[in-house]
Amino acid sequence: MRERNNLIARMSLPTRRQVISGAVVAFGGAALGLTGARAGAEEEISHTAESIHQEPVFKASRKRVYEALTDAKQFEKIVQLSAAMKSGMAPGAKPAEIGRGAGGAISLFGGYVTGRQLELVPNVRIVQAWRAGGWDPGDYSIAKFELVEQGSGTKIVFDHSAFPKGKAEHLAEGWKINYWEPLEKFLS
């Protein structure tokens, strides 16, 4: 796997209300069931937060990468190869759940990561409302995986934004050791 510079940038982000409202619009006005997020959406506090940009490259087709990230059984095998599993963070007591459609729930790494699928374009894009255990109720970030054909492989143009301040370095390392490195092993 080759990875371009891991970029952590400061940028102005929408308020929680704008993010959640946008997600509701994306589902034709249907509520997502993000109870904490809706409750937290009452705050109209604009803020500046960090974001993460990574571009890992894999020796696999876009279809294969997309399936590995959206199929619970395949993703559970990735979890087994991850640093989280080795550290005991993801004991595997609760198997991965990955909703296959927009609005579907996700629960990964033994329930440590939870959220909703916001957009799924097969073999092209995955956008998730994503949160880690220990975050304040209602704190959801946006994780976007754009799958780009690169030669005989696939580059994931990955952007993670709207997460709590001070979490960028920890999250950037987490994506590397819990997603990209085990995904590379799984796909090889």
What are these regions (language model features)?
Residues 14-35:
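N-terminal export leaders
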Residues 107-151, 161:
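Hydrophobic-ligand binding "helix-grip"
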Residues 49-55, 62, 112, 125, ...:
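Intrinsic-disorder/low-complexity, polar/charged segments enriched in Ser/Thr/Lys/Arg/Asp/Glu/Gln
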Residues 73-112, 123:
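Short beta-edge strand/loop motif at the mouth of beta-sheet-based domains
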Residues 34-68, 97-99:
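C-terminal segment of N-terminal export signals and the immediately downstream linker at the start
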Residues 1-14, 26-27:
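N-terminal secretory signal peptides
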